[in-house]
A protein has these predicted regions:
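Short, highly selective alpha-helical patches that border small-molecule cofactor pockets
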Residues: 65, 98, 102, 166, ...
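Gly/Ser/Thr-enriched, mixed-charge loops and adjacent short helices
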Residues: 17, 33-37, 42, 149-278, ...
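Buried hydrophobic packing segments
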Residues: 68-72, 124-128, 237, 241, ...
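An N-terminal, well-structured beta->alpha segment
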Residues: 4-101, 192-220
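N-terminal small/polar loop signature for handling phosphorylated ligands or for N-terminal nucleophile
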Residues: 89-148, 247-300
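Short, glycine-/Ser/Thr-/acidic-enriched flexible segments
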Residues: 14, 49-51, 56-58, 95, ...
Length: 300
């Protein structure tokens, strides 16, 4: 079963590089990787997709992500059939597949607002509501190791999908059985790049909900060490702290470098002490009072 499933990925519906990688798995005397890659389909669950990157039906790649996006497109077109133009937002951290997803949405006649660069998940959620979109996705594996990628789907309220939309979307995704059913050829006229203007609105709206502006004013110069751990937080969190009135933000330069390889940590999870080692060291060097860290998509 696994071999026949893998052989179906050798057809012209799949690109040459993918076919070559699948053939290499088939030719390998050790079948472990072949089995892991094809023994099941990567499941689109209530939280979207998450898995190891690579070729195969049980891996994150342009075809499994493509099927998820095509299925979501099909459901949006059913659910919002009365709208002249369905709109979605696409955000991403330092992982892949945002542009592929934009092409698929637009090929289905859906207007896409694509962030020009990596942005935090909370900002993507905000943008769904700010621009009056019907859905949004973010390509991120959050704090999982570099081998992983993920795909989270959101509804028009800016929250992750709940019933009945999650189950209905899953049903549509499961109907996609072959790469030939995925519309990859995008419509560039329906893809709009967004960035700084949304950042400014987002940060401005955040400052309006400060719980204690007076306390910030009194302690504006406290030393705060911040690290994004190579993720999206670097784009928004330092300017947000500045907008709130904090004047002494200390960076961890090695971890300001955006990279899906997360070169300074084993796992980019800020809940693990090892991920904070460089930030704590910087705090000791500078006599800082607070260490802040965010995970790669800055939702924790």
């Amino acid at each position: 079963m696994v071999r026949s499933k893998a052989q179906s990925w050798l057809t012209k519906s799949y690109d040459a590089e993918t076919r070559a990688q699948v053939q290499a798995l088939l030719d390998n005397e050790d079948p472990t990787e072949l089995i892991e890659s094809f023994y099941k389909d990567l499941e689109f669950g209530t939280g979207g997709l998450r898995g190891i990157m690579g070729v195969g039906s049980n891996r994150m790649n342009i075809y499994t992500v493509g099927a998820a996006t095509q299925g979501l497109s099909n459901y949006l077109k059913k659910e919002f059939a009365d709208l002249d133009q369905i709109k979605v937002v696409i955000g991403h951290d330092c992982r892949k597949f945002a542009e592929i997803s934009a092409d698929i949405f637009s090929a289905n006649g859906i207007k896409v607002y694509l962030f020009e660069d990596l942005r935090p998940t909370p900002e993507m959620s905000y943008t769904i509501r700010k621009l009056g979109c019907q859905s949004g996705i973010i390509l991120t594996a959050s704090h999982n190791p570099k081998e992983y990628n993920g795909y989270k789907a959101y509804w028009d309220d800016g929250a992750q999908m709940i019933a009945p939309h999650d189950k209905n979307t899953i049903a549509e995704v499961n109907k996609i059985r072959n790469a030939s059913e995925i519309k990859f050829k995008g419509n560039k006229e329906l893809i709009e790049i967004i960035g700084k203007e949304i950042d400014e609105q987002y940060i401005n709206d955040l400052t309006k909900i400060s719980l204690s502006p007076e306390s910030i004013a009194r302690h504006h110069d406290m030393k705060i060490v911040y690290t994004p751990i190579h993720g999206t937080g670097v784009t928004v969190i330092p300017p947000t702290l500045k907008a709130f009135g904090f004047t002494n933000i200390i960076h961890v330069p090695e971890q300001d470098v955006v990279s899906g390889d997360f070169p300074t940590v084993v796992s980019p999870n800020p809940e693990e002490p090892a991920a904070l080692a460089l930030a704590v060291e910087k705090a000791k060097e500078t006599d800082a009072e607070l260490v802040l860290a965010s995970d790669p998509d800055a939702d924790r």
